[in-house]
Regions:
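Alpha-helix N-cap/helix-start and coil->helix boundary motif
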Residues: 11, 95, 119, 193, ...
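ABC transporter nucleotide-binding domain
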Residues: 172-262
């Protein structure tokens, strides 16, 4: 598969401190790459370097095999992006904002503005001044602006902020369509792990400026994908029952009071019976599916995401 974007030892130093350190990222053409990390981990800084908004301290960025430089303006025209909060001319309409953007990018196709507004469900209000738009509507317009020039790489930093559940699902479908039907490559950061899980092909996890791992969603789903979750005030007793009375060894104490059991050979009823007979308090016992959130929290150690 063709590599759309690759970074080599990408580093950014601010006031003597590394905000991003030796990031080696590989994104394949046509895939959706979910970029995850705690608040301040370096996600936005990486995106800003890729889009030439911030100059790297060291390292390289290649776009379809061609090295990017501060003067790579033609290369940047092949990208669309939303970095942080999208800004518009508030007194102009959605369509007028898109037409101005097209002119700035040297992309003169009025139909592309119409198509982009239809894509994000804004075609019925394209003449309303943007100052009357809600946060979610502005976010949709930002995505329309990013895709109207038909970029090869779409970079979206928290693209579903401010959207209601219906809007989130609609954009999720848009992202899939852009990737599957148009062959567009997407780099998306989001704090909504459940949404990334539903659309991403590959996940990159960054922490304290370092890319910890790149892994396919298929691989994540295949890692101990099913388990039993036990919530108990008696973890020590529970561990004794699991190991000594039931002979189980494939389990993990996640937190005080939370144990995950990865043994497929025991039923919930048998497990509950053994715990009760062992005088273990059981607050909850249920089967779970190993999710992207589980994977992420294991990697970043409970810092949370933003």
């Amino acid at each position: 598969m063709v590599t759309a974007l690759q970074t080599r030892n990408l580093t950014k130093v601010y006031q003597g401190k590394e905000a991003v350190s030796d990031v080696n990222m590989t994104i394949k053409q046509g895939e959706i790459y979910g970029f995850l990390g705690p608040n301040g981990a370096g996600k936005t800084t990486v995106m800003r370097m890729i889009t030439n908004l911030v100059k790297p301290t060291s390292g390289e960025i290649e776009f379809f095999g061609e090295k990017m430089t501060p003067g790579s303006y033609e290369m940047l025209k092949r990208m669309g992006c939303i970095i942080e909060y999208p800004v518009f001319y508030d007194k102009l309409s959605a369509r007028e904002n898109l037409m101005l953007h097209g002119e700035y990018m040297g992309y003169y196709d009025p139909q592309s503005a119409t198509a982009a507004l239809e894509l994000v469900k804004l075609s019925d209000i394209n003449n309303k001044p943007v100052k009357q738009f809600s946060l979610g509507m502005k976010q949709r317009l930002g995505i329309a602006r990013a895709v109207m020039t038909k970029p090869e790489l779409l970079i979206l930093d928290e693209p579903i902020n401010g959207l209601d559940p219906v809007g989130i699902k609609e954009l999720r479908d848009v992202f899939r369509m852009l990737s599957r039907e148009y062959g567009m490559t997407l780099l998306i950061s989001s704090h909504l792990l459940g949404e990334i899980e539903q659309v991403a092909d590959t996940i990159g996890v960054i922490r304290e400026g370092r890319l910890m791992e790149e892994v396919s969603m298929e691989s994540i789903r295949g890692r101990n994908s099913h388990y039993i979750e036990l919530v108990t005030p008696d973890s020590t007793k529970a561990v004794y029952v699991l190991s000594h009375q039931l002979g189980l060894n494939n389990f993990k104490v996640m937190d005080p009071g939370l144990i995950r059991i990865y043994d497929d050979g025991i039923t919930l009823s048998d497990l509950n019976k053994a715990l009760v007979l062992g005088d273990v308090g059981v607050e909850n016992l249920s089967r779970k599916h190993h999710s992207l959130e589980d994977y992420f929290m294991e990697r970043i150690g409970g810092e949370g995401i933003a």
